[in-house]
């Protein structure tokens, strides 16, 4: 079985690497990768080292329309050259030209994973018609959460018969190896020794991640817990705005902007936390939920993405209303007064069962095989 993946705007994609490593061990499928990126992507060397073909198509998302028009014939040419059994696209910028190119190239199994569901609906509604076109051009549409599946059917008007729910997944061993000595270094780096509760979030600084509500919640929480510390781990265009909001709220002593935390340090970072707090609005999935839960961190979250699918309120985590600092603060207070350790352990068991990479692998490979069987 030969699967050709397209991907845009990233020069290295962890879950594609995990798929490639697994395929190399098992001898199937054979992968080809077409990467749309401004400069030569790291994925070229990573995937070729694993024995798979990679082609680079120069693409700059700052010139989106022109870039996709430039990429379309090149995608088509590579698909005609490689003749894969399956074309699988992942993000809007590669899915729109990728699905069109695959259809023109006569590829009968065209799979799209909707990793960025809802973005255009919230921020650029006029692009929604192209999201719908992608779903029409695809033969199979992977929804990565229940909320994503409902959105695809109800708002993108995707054919329910095409939609298959396959959760994203991570290999636990790569994300749960906490190092006590590194944890001590991180405590010193963030100046949180002897403080608590330690409440953290991992997300880009963009509006729909809900940082403004986290800061509003922090202002309420510190009144009852003056030694509370909030670790905000991320980068993004809204960071300066959030920094100003922290200062205006008198929270400079309580909120720490962690800056870059290396991927290899993330398990130890989660080990610092008493609570993982997430305030996203329409999160397609959110791998950080799975990471935090697999590390046994009690989660307080808005009801979206992987959190909504996994958490039973009060059993293995706490769910609160979106766009509400008060609800987030009350959720944290509920967690602090509950058996947080037990809730974290229950969340870990749930995440290992639902969001293990093996589940994602098996669901995806099964989809390919069933789709190809129907073509025979």
Where are these regions (language model features)?
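N-terminal strand-loop element at the rim of the active site
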Residues: 5-70, 237
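A conserved mid-protein helix/loop that constitutes part of the nucleotide-sugar donor-binding site
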Residues: 13-21, 197, 201-223, 237-243, ...
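Short alpha-helical donor nucleotide-sugar binding micro-motif in glycosyltransferases
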Residues: 79, 260-261, 268-273
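Short His-centered aromatic/hydrophobic patch
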Residues: 89-95, 114
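A short, well-ordered alpha-helix in the C-terminal region of glycosyltransferases
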Residues: 185-188, 341-354, 363-366
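Aromatic "clamp/platform" in nucleotide-sugar-dependent glycosyltransferases that forms part
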Residues: 281
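Short hydrophobic beta-strand element within catalytic cores of glycosyltransferases
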Residues: 298-301, 311
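Conserved acidic donor-binding segment of nucleotide-sugar-dependent glycosyltransferases
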Residues: 313-314, 318-325, 334-339
